[in-house]
C-alpha cells in the first residue's frame, strides 16, 4: 500500500530491497514515521509511531481517527491548486490563519515542491510551488492508510 503523502528521505522505493531482513515482531515501532512507507508496506497488527514534526503527527492522527473529516477539509483546497492560491494559503498558514492544519499539511505536501515541507529560520514554511495536482486522487489512499494505522 502506498502512503498518502510524499516524504523526503522516505523508503517507498527501497523497501523491496530490505523488507526480507526485517525480523518477526509483535509490536512494530517507528520513531521517525514521516511518510510511513515501511509501515504501510507491512501493515502490522500493532504499531507505535512517532515523528518530531508536529504537522506530520497531526496529519497522521487525523488519518487514523477522522479520515473522512480530513478528506472533507482537504476537498476545500481542490480549486486552490494554482500558483497564486498556493502562495496565498502558505502565507496564511505562516500567519496562523489556517483552521485545519492537518488538511493544510496534505495540501502543502502534495502541491509544494517534491513533498518537501521546508521551514526558514523563523519556522515559517517556505516550500516553493510544484504544480497543480488533483488532490482527490489520494482520498482512497488516505482511507487505506487509516485502516492500516
Sequence positions of predicted segments:
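SAM cofactor-binding core of SAM-dependent methyltransferases
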Residues: 20, 24-91
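SAM-dependent nucleic-acid methyltransferase catalytic core
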Residues: 1-14, 21-22, 66-149
Amino acid at each position: 500500500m502506498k502512503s498518502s503523502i510524499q516524504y523526503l528521505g522516505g523508503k517507498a522505493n527501497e523497501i523491496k530491497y530490505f523488507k526480507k531482513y526485517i525480523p518477526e515482531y509483535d509490536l512494530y515501532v517507528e520513531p521517525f514515521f514521516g511518510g510511513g512507507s515501511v509501515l504501510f508496506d507491512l501493515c502490522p497488527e500493532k504499531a507505535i509511531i512517532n515523528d518530531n514534526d508536529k504537522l506530520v503527527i497531526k496529519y497522521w492522527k487525523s488519518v487514523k481517527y477522522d479520515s473522512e473529516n480530513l478528506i472533507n477539509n482537504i476537498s476545500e483546497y481542490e480549486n486552490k491548486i494554482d500558483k497564486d492560491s498556493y502562495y496565498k494559503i502558505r502565507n496564511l498558514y505562516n500567519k496562523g490563519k489556517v483552521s485545519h492544519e492537518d488538511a493544510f499539511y496534505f495540501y502543502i505536501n502534495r502541491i509544494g515542491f517534491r513533498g518537501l515541507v521546508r521551514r526558514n529560520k523563523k519556522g515559517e514554511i517556505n516550500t516553493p510551488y510544484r504544480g497543480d495536482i488533483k488532490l482527490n486522487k489520494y482520498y482512497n489512499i488516505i482511507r487505506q492508510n487509516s485502516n492500516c494505522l
